[in-house]
């Protein structure tokens, strides 16, 4: 496996060098810069596997850097870990709304940072593994059947090996794209892909926020906030649901959590 490339965008040189030394000891390749604009340029040039991003910086802050990366087709899928002195819950929520994958507050434990980096990279690497979907063609909805036929024409191997299908929604595990009946093809961020993949791979199951934090994103027990899950669910619904206020794909079961359900095909 090739060495992962980590880009550190941090204006505090001492903090930046400390992170660099620690991650270099774990055999990561490191690039550093002290401002957001240069960070975006470096990311475009080198396509890092992960960005560690400070919030408070000169010129443009970390939130704006994150938003620009998420709106850039070349950079939109790169995982981003916010590292900042901002500790209020609303600051964390703002970071996730901007598109962050994880959030660590200063002062931080350098070993915890390394573990979070490794967890994010593990989640990203899972995307390379195709999952076998055993649902037969006769059970596909008309929309899903059309998508599956189009994908099969592009591939030499059975398309069922690299897709998950629930109702009208088709997840392509090779391209990390979700085909939806109202928004067409949607390219998911790594954290959105992991969430959708887990739910679609377990249709009908209920997942509490704590269970999703543990099973999808490798958060240790009793860590992570349910608010983070709600933000990720909201962002995802905004992208894939016909009416995010009345979701039909990812449903909320009050008091229990979230689920996707396989509806019967009547045609």
Predicted segments, located by residue:
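A structural micro-motif at secondary-structure boundaries
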Residues: 159-193, 259-267
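Positively charged, aromatic-enriched patches within helix-turn-helix-type DNA-binding elements
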Residues: 179, 183-190, 194-231, 235-248, ...
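Basic, amphipathic DNA-recognition helix from helix-turn-helix-like DNA-binding domains
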Residues: 77, 81-165
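Active-site beta3 strand of CheY-like receiver
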Residues: 46-52
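Receiver (REC) domain active-site loop signature in two-component systems and cognate sites
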Residues: 57
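Conserved Asp/Asn-Gly motif in the active-site loop of CheY-like receiver
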Residues: 33-37, 92
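Two-component/phosphorelay signaling modules centered on CheY-like receiver
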Residues: 12-32, 45
């Amino acid at each position: 496996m090739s060495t992962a490339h980590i880009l550190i965008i941090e204006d505090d040189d001492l903090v930046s060098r400390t992170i660099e030394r620690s991650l270099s000891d774990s055999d990561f390749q490191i690039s550093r810069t002290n401002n957001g604009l240069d960070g975006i340029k470096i990311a475009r040039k080198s396509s890092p596997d992960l960005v560690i991003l400070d919030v408070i910086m000169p010129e443009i802050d970390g939130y704006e850097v994150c938003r620009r990366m998420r709106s850039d087709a070349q950079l939109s899928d790169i995982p981003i870990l916010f590292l900042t002195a901002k500790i209020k819950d609303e600051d964390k929520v703002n970071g996730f709304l901007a598109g962050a994958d994880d959030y660590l507050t200063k002062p931080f434990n350098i070993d915890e940072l390394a573990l979070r980096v490794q967890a994010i990279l593990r989640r990203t690497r899972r995307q390379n593994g195709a999952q076998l979907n055993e649902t037969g063609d006769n059970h596909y909805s008309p929309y899903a059947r059309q998508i599956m036929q189009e994908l099969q024409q592009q591939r030499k191997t059975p398309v069922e090996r690299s897709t998950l299908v629930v109702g009208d929604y088709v997840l392509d595990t090779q391209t990390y794209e979700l085909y939806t009946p109202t928004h067409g093809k949607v390219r998911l961020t790594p954290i959105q892909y992991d969430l959708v993949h887990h739910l679609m791979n377990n249709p009908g199951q209920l997942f509490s926020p704590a269970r999703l934090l543990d099973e999808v994103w490798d958060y240790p027990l009793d860590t992570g906030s349910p608010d983070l899950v709600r933000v990720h669910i909201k962002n995802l619904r905004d992208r894939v649901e016909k009416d995010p206020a009345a979701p039909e794909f990812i449903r909320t079961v009050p008091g229990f959590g979230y689920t996707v359900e396989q509806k019967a095909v009547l045609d």
